[in-house]
């Protein structure tokens, strides 16, 4: 695929007032989500739930793409239409999570490195044939006493850049996600410092490995205090700190940035995004790539009556998409 085609896909992913829904939960994660609302974790229930999300009427009004898990990209609607085809036919770009998860980084207690580079070229080639047009790889950066180390950041951004280069070789837009974890008692200045260091290293690694930024999307953490920090930040503080951090680290040529919700409540994730988009002018579109913050309310409703509440749960998904779509324009009223 040409650079022009990659750039076109990347720009479509961050189209004005649209974001990306993350439904790429691993088997273990979806098991926890289902268990929390009393749904049996079997393949048909997982398929039905993903169908609920992906076939929500008019979803493409506010959703440009969806990140799928390996199981989901191979599944179909009840009517037998493969999910990637259904999505493409309804204006939603299919994406695929390709990393194999984060594991302890040898020699660095309390730190993690994401695995999954082995065999990635062949997997990306297959995913492209299955209909995927972008991919996602998540790195995990913890904040604690004397962490993250430079070694941890370097190991993770090197893997992100290798993944990104392989994606572009195979015609997929790489979404690079260095998640700075909210867990901990660190304050907002510590979150800023770690996020800034991580993003500086990431874009240096992308440059060194010849990744074309015009065909790349950043999935970023907001700069936010740890969940156990006594001094929580206001909506405006989070918005201003996040935008300042991004402006100091992210090249303006990047097509756009989408945020992860990272354990924020539905209302927080939407309010923070909205406040950021009121801080004009911005060099790039700021939108969303939420998982829990898009799904949780709908999942709870669906669990109460999986047949009877199917359409009602889809309406909840649509409303959450609309709220976040408005926030991506700075027009959410709360």
From Swiss-Prot:
It is an enzyme of class 4 (lyase). Gene3D superfamilies: Aldolase class I. SUPFAM superfamilies: Aldolase. Disulfide bonds: none annotated. Coiled coil: none annotated. GO terms for molecular function: fructose-bisphosphate aldolase activity. GO terms for biological process: glycolytic process. Pathway: Carbohydrate degradation; glycolysis; D-glyceraldehyde 3-phosphate and glycerone phosphate from D-glucose: step 4/4. It comes from the Bacteria. Keywords: Glycolysis, Lyase. Its EC number is 4.1.2.13. It holds the Pfam family Glycolytic. The keyword Magnesium does not apply. It catalyses: beta-D-fructose 1,6-bisphosphate = D-glyceraldehyde 3-phosphate + dihydroxyacetone phosphate. Belongs to the class I fructose-bisphosphate aldolase family. This is Probable fructose-bisphosphate aldolase class 1. It comes from Xylella fastidiosa (strain 9a5c).
